[in-house]
């Protein structure tokens, strides 16, 4: 943790004089923590305090990069930096990639025009690039003796590295299970939240990274999902009813539906909706139909919405909802609330020091 971090907590929480300062340091360094239990207590408090009993709970899921420096920090790697990247140039940065899940509080009574995304669960995504920092190729030619010496040095370093890794696993009990992808981490958190509130109904809004098979195919019964469809995804009509007996298994999907461009140009009438809400301002023309996103959700029936900006500021995209009874306006309105999680990421980094901790021990991270 950064220098004087716990002391800053004591001062900012107005706890000076309530006890000796060493009590606070001992609490954070020696107490046994169960972070998921802490998340559960926070989620229950938010739901009981800010959400009515019969309301559907809206969740937003995404990931964010916390930039770090140095190889000693546990769990760091090279990740895509969406903040620094542009449409034509992709930039990666060294740091932690956190996948998080937030409860969306829309238009509360104390702030009727605001939407807040309050984090209730997080997971650290780890990739295999954590040991490649600073190992650039040299442009100078090496002699045979230099290569031999470098090879000997590399073998010695590899042996020391294996020994250090074995020691770290013994001391810190590092989990050696296969690494999970970000969508798999999101699916894990969704299942966890569903177990906390088995009697509540949820709507999860995500971007295109989390709207595929890993999340959709494992969606709990009390969850609905709203997200964008991949631009090149194959959509199908529902399987037609069997009119006569035939050999083999029953069809699971019907004919393939039109692509985004073909659906945009066909003769189906557009409907225009005007939006003036948090995250979405302007007029959109939409078309809707039901079908299957077979690669992601198998034979689960979905509601598809083709959205086109009348001004041309937004790309034409297809969104889907697992609740086929929702109308297009409601689907787009709920999806626009996802922007609140981006604001939460920004505020946590700028005002709460999310990027400041630099821990070298797995449990501390």
Regions found by a protein language model. Name each.
Residues 13, 72-73, 110-365:
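Single, function-defining residue in the core of a domain
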Residues 1-3, 324-325:
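Short acidic alpha-helix initiation/capping motifs at coil-to-helix transition points
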Residues 29-145, 289-290:
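Active-site-proximal, Lys/Arg-enriched surface segment
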Residues 2-81, 191-192, 199, 244-245, ...:
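Electropositive nucleic-acid engagement tracts
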Residues 28, 62-65, 105, 208-210, ...:
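Short, flexible loop/turn elements at secondary-structure junctions
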